[in-house]
């Protein structure tokens, strides 16, 4: 399968990205950042307003200390087949990034598209003088854990939540 990978340069495809996210999410993907951001109501349930929340988050460009970057993979018909949401943060101490989301069309898994997205993001991080990349993953998302370990990511903590 032929595909291209590029950083999203404008907001004209936000609705398409939101729809792609919603179509390819699973509950195993939910981690504490999905709960904190309001995307999920707890570790097993997505927010019923997920479309509006994602649209707002993907359109948000008002914060000067952070920058949201979205890397997409698309096929020859320009359909999105994969996406990576990358949050670049300037903490005042050093610049780092949070790999917030990475989703692939389930029908094309195993074709190295996820690897291409991640390798591209890592290379760009070096170009942007980013010192490290953080990510977190749902506790049951074993496939993602193995994938990220393969690329040198190390487990540095465990997160716990008490829903009130």
Regions found by a protein language model. Give the residues of each.
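Conserved N-terminal entry element of GNAT/NAT acetyltransferase domains
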Residues: 1-37
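A conserved beta-turn-beta hairpin within the catalytic core of GNAT-like acetyltransferases
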Residues: 89-99, 109, 155-156
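Conserved acetyl-CoA-binding loop-helix of GNAT-fold acetyltransferases
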Residues: 101-104, 110-123, 150
């Amino acid at each position: 399968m032929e595909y291209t990978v590029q950083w999203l340069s404008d907001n004209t495809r936000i609705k398409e990205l939101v729809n792609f996210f919603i179509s390819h999410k699973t509950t195993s993907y939910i981690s504490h950042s999905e709960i904190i951001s309001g995307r999920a109501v707890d570790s097993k349930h997505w927010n019923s307003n997920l479309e509006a929340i994602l649209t707002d988050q993907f359109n948000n460009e008002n914060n000067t200390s952070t920058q949201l970057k979205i890397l997409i993979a698309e096929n020859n018909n320009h359909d999105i087949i994969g996406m990576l949401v990358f949050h670049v943060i300037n903490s005042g101490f050093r610049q780092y990034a949070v790999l917030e989301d990475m989703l692939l069309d389930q029908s094309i898994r195993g074709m190295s598209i996820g690897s291409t997205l991640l390798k591209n993001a890592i290379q760009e991080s070096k170009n942007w003088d980013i010192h490290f990349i953080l990510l977190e993953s749902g506790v049951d998302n074993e496939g993602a854990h193995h994938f990220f370990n393969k690329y040198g990511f190390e487990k540095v903590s465990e997160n716990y939540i008490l829903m009130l």
